[in-house]
């Protein structure tokens, strides 16, 4: 499985990439997409939605299950990935084309408190 070193991770199997200007990009990990199986639909809250850390910001629907998506940080949704209309992109490219939302972060320390790649690998038994 692939777990990029430059990302932060959550116990809910989401990744966070720090962008410019206090924003982060969020998606689900390779482990999560593998566990879910074939993803057929992704729904997220719209741009402008204010989230608190751990708020549900959307759902991922796979052939065998539906999973909630949890905000890894507090902030406001700044962008939603239009490519999610073809939800299978999350299976084929969870870290690049299959990202889900971008958030303008209220408190950068929340990002720093997320798991490193080494910590996340221990969580998933890698």
UniProtKB/Swiss-Prot annotation:
The modification N6-lipoyllysine is found at residue 64. GO terms for biological process: glycine decarboxylation via glycine cleavage system. Transmembrane segments: none annotated. One of its GO terms (cellular component) is glycine cleavage complex. Residues 23-104 form the Lipoyl-binding domain. Binds 1 lipoyl cofactor covalently. The keyword Acetylation does not apply. The keyword Lipid biosynthesis does not apply. InterPro entries: 2-oxoA_DH_lipoyl-BS (IPR003016), Biotin_lipoyl (IPR000089), GCV_H (IPR002930), GCV_H/Fam206 (IPR033753), GCV_H_sub (IPR017453), Single_hybrid_motif (IPR011053). The glycine cleavage system catalyzes the degradation of glycine. The H protein shuttles the methylamine group of glycine from the P protein to the T protein. This is Glycine cleavage system H protein. The gene is gcvH.
């Amino acid at each position: 499985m692939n777990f990029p070193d430059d990302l932060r991770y959550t116990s809910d199997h989401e990744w966070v990439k720090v962008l410019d200007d206090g924003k982060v990009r969020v998606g689900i990990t390779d482990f999560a997409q593998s566990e879910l199986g074939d993803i057929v639909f992704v729904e997220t809250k719209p741009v402008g939605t204010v989230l608190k850390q751990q708020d549900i910001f959307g759902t991922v629907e796979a052939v065998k299950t539906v999973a909630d998506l949890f905000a890894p940080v507090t902030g406001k949704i700044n962008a939603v990935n239009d490519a999610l209309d073809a939800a299978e992109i999350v299976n084929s490219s969870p870290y690049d084309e299959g990202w889900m939302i971008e958030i303008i972060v209220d408190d950068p320390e929340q990002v720093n408190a997320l798991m490193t790649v080494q910590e996340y690998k221990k969580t998933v038994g890698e």
